[in-house]
Amino acid sequence: MSAYLFLLMLVLIGVISNNQSVIIASSVLLIIKAIGFGDQLFPTLASKGISWGVTIITIAVLVPIATGDIGFKELWNSIKGPVGIVAFASGMFVAIAAGQGVQLMRVDPVVTTALLAGTILAVGFMKGIPVGPLVGAGIAALILGGYQVIEKWF
């Protein structure tokens, strides 16, 4: 019963914060659970959902290449200036951090729970978008790695 209440609360948070992603995700999960398909679908969604989501985001990002709006010339011109260099480096950093984050989420369930809570709060009330768990886990992994290095010194 608490799962239903939690999901309903997330739908309400989504409505209050006008966050369509939270409304849709929470509603879909609530419906799947209510019609009795949770046991069949939740394990697959849990194990493959992030990968599917990353694939969909990647498709959306690559659409300008597919339409011809961005080609090699535009790509090269975009990374020549300071803003482009910072954006390029940031993209690399976030991708590397997210990769580390996926690994951390696999080995430490406590991290996943804390990240989920932070993501729900940020998405629900601060206009965030729910890519936070991957990036958040990546940043956490980098910080924890730095902490472990410092801890060895002292």
Swiss-Prot record:
The keyword Membrane applies. It is found in: Cell membrane. It comes from the Bacteria. Its main location: membrane. It is a multi-pass membrane protein. The chain crosses the membrane at residues 5-25, 52-72, 82-102, 107-127, 129-149. Belongs to the UPF0756 family. This is UPF0756 membrane protein EAT1b_0668.
